[in-house]
């Protein structure tokens, strides 16, 4: 097979192709940053928020925030997302661990962050901490 004919699909592309079936009827929390995009560079936040059969209820931002507007090393605060109006919980603020209050309205967590595999990046540890928190609260990831 020639490399030019190989098409890589990200998770959001697969979810779109499946019409988000696995998220239907669930309250969805999204852990993401600006790397969470589809093949047209549309934000996963906006895609899930606009999908009629997805109930996106909360966003979770790692270092740099969900929209990438926080400098490296700065603490990220809990805010409302200006575009969607959804609550944005910081994963890089006063606590690096999810509190029960952060997860109380969520049935399933979607993690959409690309990582380069560099040990100085905090995204992989964010994934580990939140999948652990999800398991503790019987949430699906």
Q: Whereabouts are the PLM-identified features?
A:
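Bacterial Sec-dependent N-terminal signal peptides
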Residues: 1-4
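N-terminal phosphate-binding or glycine-rich loops at protein starts, especially the Walker A/P-loop
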Residues: 7-54
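Short internal beta-strands
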Residues: 55-63
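Redox-cofactor binding/interface segments in oxidoreductases and associated redox assembly factors
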Residues: 61, 111-112
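Glycine-rich oxoanion-binding loops at beta->alpha junctions
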Residues: 72-105, 118
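Glycine/threonine-rich flexible loop motifs
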Residues: 115-126
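Conserved small/polar residues in nucleotide/adenosyl-binding loops
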Residues: 130-137
């Amino acid at each position: 097979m020639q490399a030019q004919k190989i098409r890589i699909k990200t998770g959001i592309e697969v979810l779109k192709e499946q019409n988000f079936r696995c998220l239907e009827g669930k309250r969805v929390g999204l852990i993401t940053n600006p790397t969470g995009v589809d093949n047209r560079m549309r934000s996963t936040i906006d895609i899930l928020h606009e999908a009629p059969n997805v109930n996106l209820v909360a966003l979770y931002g790692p270092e740099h925030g969900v929209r990438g507007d926080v400098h490296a090393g700065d603490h990220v605060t809990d805010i409302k997302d200006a575009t969607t109006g959804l609550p944005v919980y910081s994963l890089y603020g006063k606590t690096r661990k999810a509190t029960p209050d952060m997860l109380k309205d969520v049935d399933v967590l979607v993690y959409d962050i690309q990582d380069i595999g560099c040990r100085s990046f905090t995204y992989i540890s964010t994934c580990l901490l939140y999948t652990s928190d999800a398991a503790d609260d019987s949430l699906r990831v």
